[in-house]
Amino acid sequence: MLKYPEIDPVALSLGSVTVFGKTINLPDIHWYGLMYLFGFILCWAVGTYRAGKPHNVVHKSWLEDLVFYVAMGVVLGGRCGYVFFYNFGAFLDDPLWLFRVWEGGMSFHGGLLGVILAMMLYARKMQVRFLDLMDFVAPLVPIGLGLGRIGNFIGQELWGRVTTLPIGMVFPKDPGVARHPSQLYQAALEGLVLFAVLFWFSSKPRPRAAVASLFLILYGCFRFAVEFVREPDAHIGFDMFGWLTRGQELSLPMIIIGALIFFYAYRHPAYAEKAPDPRANGSKKG
């Protein structure tokens, strides 16, 4: 069996401060939150590199705004997705729980919907095609996914099912059994492998929506597969047939829709063209 590396989920404890004689406890900074920050920084760096390619519609000067829109989509969509897809009962009992993000609870599928909405707004603002923008963003998403799963691993959350295989790991929060380190499986597949494939695939001009649809297909397949060794949410369990999880139910439409779009993209190919930066002459601000 593998041994958990005993990483403290709290990266930095800020302690407390005294203001006008009153002690205020400052929040701890967790590795999970830092992984989001590292992910956005790396997305900006890789996006800046990719923006220099002539077949991408995004200009380097857009990256700060673009990453901000993506970040808002991830955080707001991820939180709303978790509440409505995975724990709607808790929301009905306490609607304000939706806003207590620090208590945990984020959903990739909700984050994806949030990013899609954010990119619709940004595409309209910058006067570019929405699908061209999604093709640019898609290869950046696995960076955040992989780092987020590492954050889950450090926090000992979203672990795998019990196993007797040598790859099983004993987590200190549940020392009685060995489990699949499914967070690391997801970090490898949804993070490293997905990034490598999409980065390579998008390095040349591809038909409009081909890159984004390939992301949907591959992520859906990877997530569906890993769900077989990932522990279902305790308050949900299995949804259908006694074995299908909520994550698999949400991933199946991604695979189907992605495959249909990918087929259509190559059947009726159209290619993005890089237009002049509308902000270069000051016509766009912000």
Swiss-Prot record:
Its GO biological process terms?
lipoprotein biosynthetic process
Give the EC number(s) under which this enzyme is classified.
2.5.1.145
Residues that coordinate or bind a 1,2-diacyl-sn-glycero-3-phospho-(1'-sn-glycerol): 149
The places in or outside the cell where this protein is found are: Cell inner membrane
User: What is the topology of this protein in the membrane according to its UniProt annotation?
Assistant: Multi-pass membrane protein
Q: Which keywords has UniProt assigned to this entry?
A: Cell inner membrane, Cell membrane, Membrane, Transferase, Transmembrane, Transmembrane helix
Functionally, this protein is described as follows: Catalyzes the transfer of the diacylglyceryl group from phosphatidylglycerol to the sulfhydryl group of the N-terminal cysteine of a prolipoprotein, the first step in the formation of mature lipoproteins.
Which family is this sequence assigned to?
Belongs to the Lgt family.
Could you tell me what this protein is called? Phosphatidylglycerol--prolipoprotein diacylglyceryl transferase
Q: Which organism is it from?
A: Teredinibacter turnerae (strain ATCC 39867 / T7901)
Name the encoding gene, please.
Answer: lgt
